[in-house]
């Protein structure tokens, strides 16, 4: 897959660059770490409040969706996209849990050591990459399904291979994220997780990592989903029968909702890279950069909230499965024989 080969090359390149960059420590990077104004504190506190509100919605909804899809897929195995959707929602849940830990750590409600900080940030970056790439995979499968009108790809080994490749590539893309993690020690080796940049070359490498993430989290998903939105609008309506119009409308809604979140996210990431590039160490520049980074950190949470709501509860099929889940009917063999959903549904 493209993401796998790209991630592999990027990871090896970063490791080589890292070895060359950090072999020299004579150039000290001057960064204004002391400019913490009331505006920055209020923005950080507002970020924590917004994260708390989103997490109270994301975690319960994702749990219900995961349980419903797991039980339904275990007893019916009717749709090929169900395993992909399950891993997508699990990845979103892991991302939300890491946000919860980082928020508690920033508010001094919990302390982490160096290894835990690196692990949390690694999972944060890997889950974000995995979720965005998995959305593209699901859209590709839906396009192939509607175009061919049949599913010829029900091999579990094939599904496991795709998930495994995507998992490994996401993990490799997340490796650079842990390079700058340091702990502001408060209780022994435990304290607050921070991003510390010690040299100018390390700062340049940090900007390079941000550019790669801008491609993986911004440009790549936006281009892929824009392409699919155009294809669904022009090609699939001419190929599919009228009975699939609801499915086409549903897919268009999914992609359009994604683009409504992703395009502003891409703009915010581009502005963040711009502020990092100009390296304005004044107090005003630090405040502007911090506010942009706060907005950039909130955008993935909006994705995590929208995925289960749009991909699950806006679809009639899932609502029926959810009602069966509440009524404990998913394990009813007679109901299982009665219901034989279309292969394109999930």
UniProtKB/Swiss-Prot annotation:
Main location as per UniProt: host cell
UniProt-listed InterPro entries: CCR1-9-like, GPCR_Rhodpsn, GPCR_Rhodpsn_7TM
Transmembrane segments: 32-56, 84-108, 116-142, 160-181, 209-229, 246-272, 287-310
UniProt keywords, alphabetically: G-protein coupled receptor, Host cell membrane, Host membrane, Membrane, Receptor, Transducer, Transmembrane, Transmembrane helix
GO molecular-function terms, A-Z: C-C chemokine binding; C-C chemokine receptor activity
Membrane topology per record: Multi-pass membrane protein
Topology Extracellular: residue spans: 1-31, 109-115, 182-208, 273-286
Highest taxon of the lineage: Viruses
Tagged with keyword Secreted: no
GO biological process, one term: calcium-mediated signaling
PROSITE patterns according to UniProt: G_PROTEIN_RECEP_F1_2
Cellular compartments annotated: Host cell membrane
GO CC entries: host cell plasma membrane; membrane
Pfam families xrefs: 7tm_1 (PF00001)
Cytoplasmic face of the membrane: 57-83, 143-159, 230-245, 311-346
Family: Belongs to the G-protein coupled receptor 1 family.
Stored PANTHER family: CELL ADHESION MOLECULE, G-PROTEIN COUPLED RECEPTORS FAMILY 1 PROFILE DOMAIN-CONTAINING PROTEIN
Record protein name field: G-protein coupled receptor homolog U12
Gene name tied to this protein: U12
